[in-house]
From Swiss-Prot:
It comes from Streptomyces griseus. Residues 46-61 have a biased composition (Basic residues). It holds the Pfam family Fer4_15. Keywords: Antibiotic biosynthesis, Hydrolase. Residues 2-29 form the 4Fe-4S ferredoxin-type domain. Probable thioesterase involved in the biosynthesis of candicidin. Could release the macrolide ring from the polyketide synthase. The active site is at 201. One of its GO terms (molecular function) is hydrolase activity. Pathway: Antibiotic biosynthesis; candicidin biosynthesis. The lineage of its organism: Bacteria, Bacillati, Actinomycetota, Actinomycetes, Kitasatosporales. This is Probable cadicidin biosynthesis thioesterase. Residues 36-110 are annotated as: Disordered.
Amino acid sequence: MRVTVDSEQCVGAGQCVLNAPEVFDQDDDGVVVLLRADPTSGTTRRSARRATCARRPRSSSRRTEPAGCADRHRCPVRPGPRTRGPADPPPANTDRRQNHRRDSPVTTADDTAARWLRRYHPAEADAVRLVCFPHAGGSASFYHPVSARFAPGAEVVSLQYPGRQDRRKEPCVPDLGTLADLITEQLLPLDERPTVFFGHSMGAALAFETAWRLEQKGAGPRTVIASGRRGPSTTRAERVHTRDDDGIVAEMKRLNGTAAGVLGDEEILRMALPALRGDYRAIETYTCPPDRRLACGLTVLTGEDDPLTTVEEAERWRDHTTGPFRLRVFTGGHFFLTQHLDAVNTEIAQALHPDRAAPAA
């Protein structure tokens, strides 16, 4: 039997397009294959892989989600087409999966939202909301550990941009303003509740732009946490997106956020580089008016040795809010947050629940 696997919905799938310990793809016959990177050896094994998520029991009339699957999402494991024999009964249109095939010409609002907004764990009915914006080349599953940490007390929504993982056949959005418009369209219909935005690197600028758009419609977040990014109107002459593939890989090595074994694997890079190039173009061509300000609180996190952002440049976020501002400097480089997970989680927890104890300075 052939199956289709949505990699970002399977626990253990890649944390990031290029950090991915496991990357799923399909061969020309539609058979799922697993590209497993071994950072210790720098090699990649390619093998057929059957899905690890349990399928819904056929005898049950009640829809149940397999363990590890996102709430409100279809099971990421779906049987492929089978040729019916003469003794088979005619197909009945009772299976909801038949109405949600990827090649269906009809796309509902729920289908569109599900492509953009990923929820890995259920949340309490009155939970606060945390919306997470990935960095350039990143994917929603980068924030799976964050979702596990804060659910069910928070509804953690991770954004999945086009051009990666299960959306890799969709074109990337190479303009950050356009991407913010599209995300705003998906977040605006959500029910009203206290909301915090968290974004790292490109995700920080995108969180800011989305928050500003939502504020214009009276639906902004309570707080934005911007990590690993200089103030929005502070620019540098960066042109990584115009480099050849080797040049983009060299930049990833410089930032030291990706396993060397992954960067040396041509097959994984073939899938990842289009998203990286598109995202770099979006953030490197982004401009922000110096008078664009949020009304909500703004917390900025930065690494003292980040080659993309000096502490002074991170401080310039202060000019882009009329609300409370806080800057916290960590040891480390651009991906300092992987070295300070507990401290970063403390910052997020304080933003989600400001009535509780304040984080250490």
